[in-house]
């Protein structure tokens, strides 16, 4: 099935346009690279319960704000993202969903189904209001694009660090713990990391 998808009519057209623009040598390399990628088998690596239990008992104190810009997100994708965040082994997080339209009702329905009280955006003005594992729904007045929508969510963040997550992405259960652990280790070494980017097993 993977090989069939490589040689679809759509891909052949793209290859032809690429060849015209970049020449036959570059086109051949691009095709070979694509075939290699299609044949790769990726295994989703979930941590076992023993690992998660250890992480719950040995967590850093760093507070992480996760900002999710959302716009007309499909319900099933949104719920999967929310579930993946709520199941984190790391306890010190808040989730801020910056909704630019078409997502608020799905967030509210998910929260009601799971017995979660959504936080109000006004609560973020006071850091003392921080509450572990809280979820804030910020309804934006208009859709200004992913960058501006993300910035609107960041402005409400009360954490020590900010993590960016797409509205249809998933986190493995240990993702935030791994990030916080890395930051904590670097801090003890006298270093401060400004940006961290995780591999596919942590995001």
Residue ranges and their predicted role:
Residues 17-84:
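N-proximal low-complexity "stem/linker" segments adjacent to membrane-targeting elements
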Residues 174-203:
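Conserved donor NDP-sugar-binding/catalytic core segment of glycosyltransferases
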């Amino acid at each position: 099935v993977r090989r069939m998808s490589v040689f679809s009519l759509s891909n052949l057209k793209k290859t032809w346009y690429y060849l015209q623009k970049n020449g036959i040598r570059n086109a051949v390399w691009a095709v070979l690279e694509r075939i290699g990628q299609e044949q790769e088998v990726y295994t989703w690596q979930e941590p076992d319960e023993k690992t998660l239990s250890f992480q719950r008992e040995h967590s850093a104190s760093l507070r992480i704000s996760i900002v999710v810009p959302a716009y007309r997100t499909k319900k099933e994708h949104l719920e999967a993202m929310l579930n993946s965040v709520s199941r984190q082994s790391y306890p010190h997080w808040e989730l801020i969903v910056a909704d630019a339209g078409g997502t608020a009702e799905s967030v509210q329905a998910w929260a009601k189904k799971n017995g979660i009280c959504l936080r109000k955006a006004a609560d973020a003005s006071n850091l003392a209001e921080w509450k572990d594992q809280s979820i804030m729904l910020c309804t934006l007045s208009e859709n200004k694009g992913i960058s501006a929508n993300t910035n609107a969510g960041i402005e409400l963040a009360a954490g020590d660090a900010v993590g960016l997550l797409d509205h249809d992405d998933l986190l493995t259960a240990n993702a935030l713990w791994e990030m916080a652990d890395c930051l904590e280790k670097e801090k003890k070494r006298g270093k401060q990391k400004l940006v961290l980017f995780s591999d596919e097993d942590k995001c």
